[in-house]
């Protein structure tokens, strides 16, 4: 068995085309384009690259993006003031606080300070609570991007055993909520999980989000499973790896995402979708 490839780039282009068309329709009605404020703290090269990619994606679909670049020495209270300013700005429909932040700043306090209706990353307790209550509003970008990508398989997910490896607030936990909404039976594995291999072997849908290349051995993968690799590690300037060895895993899976070109483009596309959704609540 050779897996079919879940191409995140192709799926993301479909999402972006829909967003672009909806923005065009807004403009035809004389309404302003959605506005996104991105707050970037410090000089982390990876964060700067991600933000530049988001800027280009916004420009391509017609979203106005403004990047506020803050020094690494900024205090938590100063950063909170910038968020408050964006909250008040009627031309800003979405706010994104680029993570990670410097060690002296608590991200939880600042993410909670963003207005829930401008929280296009979907991390505010209000938006996560809506997801828990099965009444989603703005949804976390990577998990919802994965759900959109899964529609490309045309597989019925109801009743499937989904195993998530990784329990972060950004991916693992909201991913479990999304899969419960899709009527999957969900197992979440984390650093204290015993017999990880046995859990993985039972997965009809496997989603791995750890950031450790090779943490999942290909022989653990159930033949015919759908495999989503959210992991992203830069091994060298020209080499990027996921959490699973793609070449061997594709011989067991029915569908598999590549790294890069799988989940990453969907995260950005979902951010654009969320920004449009946030703008539509104001316009």
From Swiss-Prot:
It comes from the Bacteria. Pathway: One-carbon metabolism; tetrahydrofolate interconversion. NADP(+) binds at residues 166-168. One of its GO terms (biological process) is methionine biosynthetic process. It catalyses: (6R)-5,10-methylene-5,6,7,8-tetrahydrofolate + NADP(+) = (6R)-5,10-methenyltetrahydrofolate + NADPH; (6R)-5,10-methenyltetrahydrofolate + H2O = (6R)-10-formyltetrahydrofolate + H(+). One of its GO terms (molecular function) is methenyltetrahydrofolate cyclohydrolase activity. Homodimer. HAMAP family: THF_DHG_CYH. Catalyzes the oxidation of 5,10-methylenetetrahydrofolate to 5,10-methenyltetrahydrofolate and then the hydrolysis of 5,10-methenyltetrahydrofolate to 10-formyltetrahydrofolate. This is Bifunctional protein FolD. The gene is folD.
């Amino acid at each position: 068995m050779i897996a079919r490839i879940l191409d995140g780039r192709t799926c993301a282009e479909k999402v972006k085309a829909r967003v672009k068309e909806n923005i065009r329709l807004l403009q035809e009605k004389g309404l302003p384009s959605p506005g996104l404020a991105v707050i970037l703290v410090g000089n982390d090269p990876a964060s700067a690259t991600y933000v530049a990619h988001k800027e280009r994606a916004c420009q391509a679909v017609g979203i106005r993006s403004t990047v506020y670049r803050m020094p690494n020495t900024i205090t938590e209270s100063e950063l909170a003031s910038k968020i408050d300013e964006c909250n008040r700005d009627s031309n800003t429909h979405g706010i994104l606080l680029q993570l990670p932040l410097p060690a002296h700043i608590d991200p939880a306090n600042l993410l909670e300070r963003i207005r829930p209706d401008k929280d296009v990353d979907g991390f505010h307790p209000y938006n996560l609570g809506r997801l828990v209550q099965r009444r989603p509003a703005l949804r976390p970008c990577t998990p919802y991007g994965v759900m959109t990508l899964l529609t490309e398989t045309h597989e019925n997910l109801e009743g499937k055993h989904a195993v998530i490896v990784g329990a972060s607030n950004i991916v693992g936990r909201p991913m479990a909520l999304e899969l419960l909404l899709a009527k999957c039976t969900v197992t979440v594995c984390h650093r204290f999980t015993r017999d990880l291999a046995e859990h993985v072997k039972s997965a009809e849908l496997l989603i791995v989000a750890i950031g450790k290349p090779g943490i999942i051995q290909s022989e653990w993968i159930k033949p015919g499973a759908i495999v989503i690799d959210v992991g992203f590690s830069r091994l060298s300037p020209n080499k990027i790896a996921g959490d699973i060895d793609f070449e061997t895993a594709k011989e067991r899976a029915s569908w598999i995402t590549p790294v890069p070109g799988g989940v990453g483009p969907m995260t950005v596309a979902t951010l654009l979708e969320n920004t449009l959704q946030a703008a539509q609540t104001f316009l």
